[in-house]
């Protein structure tokens, strides 16, 4: 039997599983290394020959739960835990 179409029916073991850092199914179980982000290496795997891939994965393509609010909070100098001063009646009646 060759390595072509007939052999694909015999392939039943997963070599890759989910990566805890990038979430893709690229973590090689035996090597303990992610082929997409190079986890557990400290530096994330990116190459400039795959500009399109960088564009797909870069900041801004996901939820950005924290980063989405930073520009708004920056305007007020990241103040927290304060209450707005009550407006005076003069400005309220003129409006």
Swiss-Prot record:
Signal peptide: none
Residue ranges of the region described as Disordered: 73-95
SUPFAM superfamilies: Zn-binding ribosomal proteins
Cofactor binding, note field: Binds 1 zinc ion per subunit.
Entry cofactors: Zn(2+)
Binding-site residues, Zn(2+): 19, 22, 34, 37
Zinc finger annotations (C4-type) as residue ranges: 19-37
GO MF term set: mRNA binding; rRNA binding; structural constituent of ribosome; zinc ion binding
GO-annotated biological processes: translation
Keywords: Metal-binding, Ribonucleoprotein, Ribosomal protein, RNA-binding, rRNA-binding, Zinc, Zinc-finger
One cellular component (GO) term of this entry: cytosol
Basic and acidic residues biased stretches: 77-86
Xref: InterPro entries: Ribosomal_eL37, Ribosomal_eL37/eL43, Ribosomal_eL37_CS, Ribosomal_zn-bd
Family statement drawn from the similarity comment of this UniProt entry: Belongs to the eukaryotic ribosomal protein eL37 family.
Stated role: Binds to the 23S rRNA.
Protein name: Large ribosomal subunit protein eL37x
UniProt source species: Arabidopsis thaliana (Mouse-ear cress)
Lineage of producing organism: Eukaryota, Viridiplantae, Streptophyta, Embryophyta, Tracheophyta
Underlying gene: RPL37C
């Amino acid at each position: 039997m060759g390595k072509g179409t007939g052999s694909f029916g015999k392939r039943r073991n997963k070599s890759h599983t989910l990566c805890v850092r990038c979430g893709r199914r690229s973590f090689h179980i035996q090597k303990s290394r992610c082929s997409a982000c190079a986890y557990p290496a400290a530096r994330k795997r990116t190459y400039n020959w795959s500009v399109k891939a960088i564009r797909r994965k870069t900041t801004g393509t996901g939820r950005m739960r924290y980063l989405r609010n930073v520009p708004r909070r920056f305007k007020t100098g990241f103040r927290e835990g304060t209450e707005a001063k009550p407006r005076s009646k003069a400005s309220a009646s003129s409006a």
